[in-house]
Amino acid sequence: MSAFVSGGTLPLADRLSAKLAQHRVVLVDGGVVDGLHALGLPLGEPPEAWCLDRPEAVLEVHRGLAAAGAEVVTTNSVGANHGRYGDDAEAICAASVRLARIAAPDAAIAGAIGPTGSPFERRFLFTGQATAAADLQLRIEN
């Protein structure tokens, strides 16, 4: 028996919580970068920059993944850190959240955060990720 109201009228958080409580699958998008490659992102070029340089391509990928059934859409921000982008990292993160929200208004938004700093500096790596996670969480909530 489904815990969902016909037509999906429960709020998104309730729908996702009910699925998780029932140990059901929640569909999370995948392949944002693959989608960008299909639209012309050259191998080796950071995909996060397209949030500012080619936002229409990021929107197209997110819309396609949402149309395919993704209930959770990840931001195109996995490498958007101050080490790589300096002051532009904040603008990229903000744009990645905005684009995901525009493209998939009925989906939950999850921030994608990759490694920061050197893999040899483990303490900084996790501290940097925690800082980035907190910043991205604020952007998603606001």
Short names for language-model regions:
Residues 1-142:
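Domain-level signal for soluble alpha/beta catalytic cores
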